[in-house]
Design a protein with these regions (language model features):
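Catalytic cores of RNA-modifying enzymes
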Residues: 1-83
Length: 83
């Protein structure tokens, strides 16, 4: 599944964080260690998820309510054993 064509849904309060600088600042501020577990609520298209999985965090758990986005997240990150 591709995320293209999926628009943010007001009922979920969705917006897409795309600014690479802001995403990097979030991960940097978290100061993640190898044994940390991260819970990401509302990963959307996975922009932050991607950076979290590139960090030293042990695991990244993501909860997405929009069923239209779940398969895309699984397709994109499902092979990573830390996701």
């Amino acid at each position: 599944m591709s995320f293209s064509g999926h628009t943010a849904r007001k009922r979920f309060g969705q917006h897409w964080l795309r600014d690479a600088r802001v995403l990097d600042q979030i991960v940097e501020a978290a100061r993640l260690q190898q044994d940390d577990r991260v819970l990401e609520v509302g990963p959307g298209r996975g922009a932050l998820t991607e950076r979290l999985l590139a960090s030293p965090a042990a695991q990244v758990h993501a909860i997405e309510l929009d069923r239209d986005l779940v398969q895309g997240l699984h397709d994109r990150f499902g092979t990573d054993t830390r996701f």
